[in-house]
């Protein structure tokens, strides 16, 4: 089948109307016959092997295409200015002779090939110039003097790169000199974006040079262009707090330049030197770019500086966009109280400042963190009352808020199942409305469904959702992968596996209870949705047969329904190891004894070199920690291995009452800071005491050579080997923090293991003396200590050691604010044994103010 390209063309011979129409009519008939003949021949040849024939629908489709081609050609001929005007006015078409046709065809075919080629080149060149004029002014194109740079970096507007163009202008002779600054700056502000920092400096320098250094002429468009590019930059990893950040400093420098311009303008007016034609002004867009970059740096100080500066000096108060940016900053910094205050301010300032759906979605995200479902329901009602159109993310966030709120019986007010059911109904409503979805909405939707299923303990649905999402992402990456799929499996799996999905799957395992029924199984729409996902989940094969090269497997047990604790533990271990080893591309957790021995030999030599090169213990410790971090990145998928997912993974055997499995997981995947310090110090002292003459051969190391070259006893050698193995194993371990110590204490309460409780009490006491704990904010340290003390009280209460529990409360009554909810179980136990004296002491502590509050009250009374 032939395709015709219609439309006006330049440098094409023009025929009279009658002759052109006759040519087109005969050409259509000839092309139609030839097309059908060609298709018949193809089908006859194809029928020998594929048995295909032309259907009436195919013929009708081709006729419709040819009719469209004919109509388009007629319209083009009608709109084209004819050379013979008399021919347009004639209603009858005179027949054309064969000789005339031959003469015209001969004239047409006599055009030289060189002229056709030249016409085509001219057409392409004129098209290039026309498109270039829309991108850059003519004077800029002349000064760049390289059309290849312009075409390569600017033609694709979705991926335009102005940095090479600005850098080329920077090294040119005239730069921006002798260009009208007003028209040029208007074009510049709306076009030049996403420059790197060095190109922004070049642009700023050229703009100042253009106005001969007169800052008064540095107009608003120039300021907006520079600030817009600065606001789009990302802070460096080592300067996330904004301290002495080069971008922040540049922004403040520009504001100082503007202040200087205002001062010069005022002086000129006072001296009657004439008022400038147009004074630059600060705008809301500039303030928003300042706030946008400050929030990226997580710098509250800089954000407050810009808000105060623009409000007091320029009379610009934050608008809706600015305040939304501030709320998003508070949300990221966990400053929820300030976020709610700002949100309330937006609602009562004016209609222009009233929150939009983006602001409401941010507040719903805060509700999820706070597990505040009543407030989320109020926000959704406000959205409906003010006729604000909800987005896909609004419904997703409502489902996630209700899912997180259902995790705790106290928070959910005893209505966990009802909250999860309401969350699913929001997702049903989203499906019915068929709203527009961004690329990230698919991920957020899966996460919302995973959250609802996980908190409900619906393992079957959680497995299906996890499998479907990971499979879709993996196969999409493989389909668009430009390299070798088999060779690049490590990179592909690293991009596929997600920590949030893994955490929700581990949470579903932790909430396993074969007696519970999923909330989705209670109504028809939920049953249909659940069956849909379970039908798509292949729990046995997990292999894409359509492409033998792309194999997709997840280590699920080949059964559709897990019904025992052993199955849950086995599958959770398999999925966890699969994620840690990056889709099975590494064997960190399953190394053989021979490989372990080789690692010990390798790192003994490496640690020896660190000890000999280090000037002191701190340098040796730094080198070891850097090497451990490097080992971890090379052997473990650090994207999914974090404290949150580890906490959930460790909670599975606690909820299933499997003490042995919990201790195994805890030992294998965690280490303690004080133990690490002791091992490092022991290794350093051991290596520094080895004379240089006893240094081992760098090329060959064996167990026999080690034992001969070192004068230590077998016991000392075993200790050294143990310490080296300890360092080697740190690649798959995370340091214990306050949250993990609390989890271990909860395990001791669940298992009623007094030895474990004493051990974690002592270990946490040592952790309190380490640098990581001392670096924490004092209020956070007190809150963590109080929570751990509360767990100790719960442990002694459950063991019936009420005097020990009361002793902890009395010893910390001046430090902690003990509330009744924290001692409820102890109070009930004391009431049962009718220990009136202890009850009175306990209630006296609970009802009294804390020591700090009492002192403050006494001070106020004395002042009065």
Swiss-Prot record:
Main location group: mitochondrion
Residue range covered by the transit peptide: 1-76
PPR repeat placement: 319-353, 356-390
MF GO annotations: mRNA binding; rRNA binding
Family affiliation: Belongs to the CCM1 family.
Protein name: Mitochondrial 15S rRNA processing factor CCM1
Gene: CCM1
Location relative to the cell: Mitochondrion
Coiled-coil stretches: none
Disordered: annotated segments: 80-117
InterPro entries reported in the protein's UniProt record: Pentatricopeptide_rpt, TPR-like_helical_dom_sf
Miscellaneous comment: Present with 876 molecules/cell in log phase SD medium. Involved in mitochondrial-nuclear incompatibility, a major determinant in reproductive isolation between species, through hybrid incompatibility of Ccm1 and its interacting partner 15S rRNA between yeast species.
Function: Regulates mitochondrial small subunit maturation by controlling 15S rRNA 5'-end processing. Localizes to the 5' precursor of the 15S rRNA in a position that is subsequently occupied by mS47 in the mature yeast mtSSU. Uses structure and sequence-specific RNA recognition, binding to a single-stranded region of the precursor and specifically recognizing bases -6 to -1. The exchange of Ccm1 for mS47 is coupled to the irreversible removal of precursor rRNA that is accompanied by conformational changes of the mitoribosomal proteins uS5m and mS26.
GO cellular component: mitochondrion
Pfam families hit by this protein: PPR_2
Keywords, sorted A to Z: Mitochondrion, mRNA processing, mRNA splicing, Repeat, Transit peptide
Compositional bias annotation for Polar residues: 80-94, 102-112
Subunit note: Binds to mitochondrial small subunit 15S rRNA.
Record-level GO BP terms: mitochondrial genome maintenance; mitochondrial RNA processing; mitochondrion organization; mRNA processing; positive regulation of rRNA processing; RNA processing; RNA splicing; rRNA metabolic process
């Amino acid at each position: 089948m032939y395709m015709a390209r219609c439309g006006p063309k330049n440098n094409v011979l023009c025929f009279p109307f009658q002759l052109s129409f006759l040519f087109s009519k005969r050409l259509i008939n000839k092309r139609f016959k030839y097309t059908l003949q060609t298709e018949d021949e193809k089908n006859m040849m194809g029928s020998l092997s594929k048995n295909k024939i032309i259907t009436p629908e195919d013929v009708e489709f081709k006729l419709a295409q040819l009719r469209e081609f004919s109509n388009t050609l007629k319209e083009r001929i009608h709109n084209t200015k004819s050379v013979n005007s008399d021919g347009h006015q004639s209603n009858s078409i005179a027949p054309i002779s064969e000789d005339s046709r031959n003469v015209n065809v001969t004239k047409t075919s006599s055009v030289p090939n060189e002229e056709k080629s030249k016409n085509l080149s001219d057409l392409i060149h004129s098209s290039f110039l026309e498109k270039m004029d829309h991108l850059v002014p003519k004077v800029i194109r002349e000064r760049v003097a390289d059309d290849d740079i312009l075409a390569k970096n600017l033609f694709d507007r979705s991926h335009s790169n102005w940095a090479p163009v600005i850098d080329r202008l920077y090294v040119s002779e005239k730069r921006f000199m002798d260009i009208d600054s007003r028209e040029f700056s208007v074009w510049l502000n709306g076009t030049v974006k996403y420059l790197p920092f060095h190109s922004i400096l070049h642009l700023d320098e050229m703009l100042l040079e253009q106005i001969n250094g007169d800052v008064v002429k540095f107009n608003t468009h120039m300021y907006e262009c520079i600030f817009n590019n600065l606001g789009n930059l990302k802070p460096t990893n080592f300067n996330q707090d904004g301290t002495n950040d080069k971008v922040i400093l540049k922004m403040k420098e520009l504001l100082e330049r503007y202040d200087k311009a205002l001062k010069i303008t005022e002086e000129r007016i006072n001296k009657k030197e004439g008022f400038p034609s147009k004074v630059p002004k600060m705008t809301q867009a500039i303030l928003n770019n300042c706030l946008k970059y400050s929030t990226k740096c997580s710098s509250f100080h800089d954000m407050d500086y810009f808000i105060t500066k623009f409000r007091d000096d320029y009379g610009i108060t934050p608008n809706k966009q600015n305040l939304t940016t501030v709320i998003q900053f508070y949300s990221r910094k966990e400053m929820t109280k300030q976020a709610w205050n700002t949100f309330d301010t937006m609602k009562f300032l004016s209609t222009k400042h009233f929150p939009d759906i983006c602001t409401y979605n941010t507040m719903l995200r805060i509700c999820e963190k706070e597990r505040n479902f009543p407030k989320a329901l109020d926000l959704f009602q406000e959205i409906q009352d003010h006729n604000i159109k909800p987005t896909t993310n609004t419904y997703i966030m409502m489902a996630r808020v209700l899912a997180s709120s259902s995790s705790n019986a106290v928070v959910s007010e005893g209505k966990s199942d009802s909250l999860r059911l309401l969350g699913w109904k929001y997702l049903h409503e989203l499906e019915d409305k068929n709203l527009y979805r961004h690329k990230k909405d698919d991920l957020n939707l899966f996460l919302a469904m995973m959250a609802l299923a996980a908190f409900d303990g619906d393992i079957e649905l959680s497995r299906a959702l996890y499998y479907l999402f990971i499979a879709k992402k993996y196969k999409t990456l493989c389909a668009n992968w430009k390299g070798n799929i088999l060779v690049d499996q490590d990179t592909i799996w690293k991009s596929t596996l997600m920590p949030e999905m893994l955490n929700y799957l581990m949470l579903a395992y932790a909430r396993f209870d074969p007696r519970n029924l999923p909330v989705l199984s209670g109504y028809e729409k939920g049953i249909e949705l659940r069956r849909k996902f379970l039908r798509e989940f292949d729990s046995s094969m997990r292999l894409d047969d359509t492409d033998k090269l792309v194999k997709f497997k997840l280590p699920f047990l080949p059964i559709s329904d897990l019904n025992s604790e052993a199955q849950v533990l086995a599958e959770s271990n398999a999925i966890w190891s699969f994620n840690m080893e990056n889709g099975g591309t590494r064997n960190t957790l399953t190394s053989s004894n021979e490989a372990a021995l080789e690692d010990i030999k390798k790192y003994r030599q490496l640690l020896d070199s660190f000890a000999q090169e280090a000037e002191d213990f701190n340098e040796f410790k730094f080198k070891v920690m850097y090497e451990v971090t490097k080992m971890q990145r090379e052997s473990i998928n650090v994207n999914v291995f974090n404290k949150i997912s580890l906490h959930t993974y460790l909670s599975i055997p606690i909820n299933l009452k499997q003490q042995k499995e919990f201790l195994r997981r805890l030992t294998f995947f965690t280490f303690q800071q004080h133990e690490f310090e002791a091992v490092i110090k022991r290794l350093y002292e051991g290596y520094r005491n080895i004379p240089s003459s006893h240094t081992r051969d760098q090329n060959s190391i064996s167990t026999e050579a080690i034992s001969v070259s070192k004068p230590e006893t077998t016991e000392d050698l075993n200790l050294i080997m143990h310490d080296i193995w300890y360092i080697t194993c740190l690649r798959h371990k995370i340091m214990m923090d306050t949250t993990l110590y609390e989890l271990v204490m909860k395990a001791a309460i669940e298992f009623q293991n007094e030895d474990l409780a004493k051990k974690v009490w002592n270990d946490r006491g040592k952790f309190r003396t380490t640098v990581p704990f001392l670096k924490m904010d004092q209020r956070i340290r007190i809150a963590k200590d109080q929570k751990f003390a509360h767990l100790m009280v719960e442990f002694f209460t459950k063991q019936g050691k009420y005097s020990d529990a009361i002793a902890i409360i009395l010893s910390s009554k001046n430090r902690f604010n003990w509330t009744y909810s924290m001692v409820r179980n102890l109070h009930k136990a004391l009431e049962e044994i009718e220990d009136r004296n202890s009850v009175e002491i306990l209630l006296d502590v609970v009802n009294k103010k804390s020591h700090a509050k009492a002192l403050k009250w006494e001070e106020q009374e004395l002042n009065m």
